[in-house]
Each structure stands twice: as C-alpha cells, then as structure tokens.
Amino acid sequence: GASIDIGPDVRVITSTSEGYRFHAAEGIVFKDLHPTQLNLSFLSSLGGKDSWRRYFQPKLANLVYTAELVYRYPAIKFVAVHPGVRDTELTPAWIKGNARSRRLFAPGGLKTAEEGSWNQLWATTGNNVVSGQYYEPVGIVGYRTPKLKDETPRETLWD
C-alpha cells in the first residue's frame, strides 16, 4: 500500500478528567456501556452516585483509548488532557458553594472556559509533549491508576 508522510509532529489531543481516578474498582464496566444506561437508579438525575459513575467511566475510557492509539500508531503523538475543574452549569452546587469542597475537588480554583482551554492549547503547540502522556493543567504529568497499565481494557475497548 501507499505510505503517507504525516509530518514530524502530528498530534491528537483527547479530553479527559482527573475524575477518572474515581472509576469503579473493576475499571471500565463494559456490560454497563450502552447508549441508555438502563441499570442506573432514578437518583442519577439528581446527581446520585450512578451519575458520577457514568461520568467517570468515559473519562477512564478516553485514557485507555489514548494508550491504545499510541500502541497502534506510534508515528503520531497522542496525549490526554484534563482542563481543570471549570465553572460551568455542569459543576455541582456543592463544589461551587462550599469552600471545603472546592479545596478538595478544585484545589487550583474553578477555571473559566478560557482557562479550561489552556492545557489543551499547551498540548497542541507546546514543546516536550510526550506521546501517551496524561497532563493536568498546565503541562503537569498526571497520576495514572493501575487500571491504565492493564492492556486487557485497551483491547476490549478497541474491539
């Protein structure tokens, strides 16, 4: 087949969240991944634990998927970034309105939409961006749970 010259520094940036760390103990629960989350409780719409589980799973999946892309396409630079905790309509009132919660869940403070873009812009244009890495704002290597080192979820997610 024909080869394509992709250039010296092609980058694909995936958005995730440091909240991925609160994923289920088993990691990605593939049996629960459906367009409609039928097994979630009615409390989900009220911000119950199931809505958070639904939030954390795709954030973990984005990191797992990024790792698989690095493995399959080594000539391209793939990284995942966390924008920081932003002050949006999705930010729970218990974080916005409680100083203790903000210190715990948003230690750098709530970010504006503009500030939330800085990490992605850095990953897109910055020097010393390492393929396969997960970065927290701005350009800081983020913590990786043991589930990110397991190749089985990468293969299952890809299939």
Each language-model region and where it sits:
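C-terminal helical subdomain
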Residues: 104-145, 153
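Alpha-helical membrane-targeting segments
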Residues: 43-50, 85-87, 91-112
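Alpha-helical packing segments of well-folded alpha/beta enzyme cores
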Residues: 62-65, 116-120, 157
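Intracellular terminal tails of multi-pass secondary transporters
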Residues: 148-159
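Glycine-rich loops and low-complexity Gly/Arg-rich segments
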Residues: 36-41, 103-107, 157-159
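Rossmann-fold NAD(P)H-dependent dehydrogenase/reductase core
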Residues: 1-89
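Secondary-structure boundary/capping signal
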Residues: 77, 98-99, 131
